[in-house]
Amino acid sequence: MRHNRHINHLGRTHSHRKALLSNMAVSLIKHKRIFTTLAKAKEFCKYVEPILTRSRNDTTHSRRLVFRKLCDKYAVSELFREIARKIGDRPGGYTRIIKIGNRLGDNAATCFIELVDYNELMLKTAHGGATNKIRRSRRSSPHKRDINERNNIIQEDNAMTKTIEEAKGE
């Protein structure tokens, strides 16, 4: 019986799941936003939140503990140098899951998972930027609406990466 097992195995062995979550964490630290399935994202939050909390205290011991999970020295240095500075005053909840819809091939629920303090578009709207209302026709099909929403999210993501690259260049 499966009593008291609080981990989603994601259909993988222990070593495969450990490698998957570690690689996803490195990608999130490097790119600040990743695209994945909802089940992986929910399990990934449980994995990465303690790592981000550990990075707030920059000691040799905490660096070694984080490196044990990530196994990428560039990701560890970026985590302690840049990300820890931004999340230093936040008491928790460093990641955000944005549901996108279902994948066309296998109908899996997909989402973006991102670091909360790195989404400039949401930060601008939260600090007083006006949002535009979306007007929808009654005749539009839900399938077309899902595709349009995905395209809008991808365009926003591309625009955000361009602004981040321009900011790094300056």
From Swiss-Prot:
Family annotation (Pfam families): Ribosomal_L17
Record's signal peptide: none
Keywords, in A-Z order: Ribonucleoprotein, Ribosomal protein
Highest taxon in the source lineage: Bacteria
GO molecular function, one term: structural constituent of ribosome
GO cellular component terms, A-Z: cytosolic large ribosomal subunit
One annotated GO biological process: translation
Protein family per UniProt: Belongs to the bacterial ribosomal protein bL17 family.
Subunit record text: Part of the 50S ribosomal subunit. Contacts protein L32.
NCBIfam families given in the database record: L17 (TIGR00059)
Name listed for the protein in its UniProt record: Large ribosomal subunit protein bL17
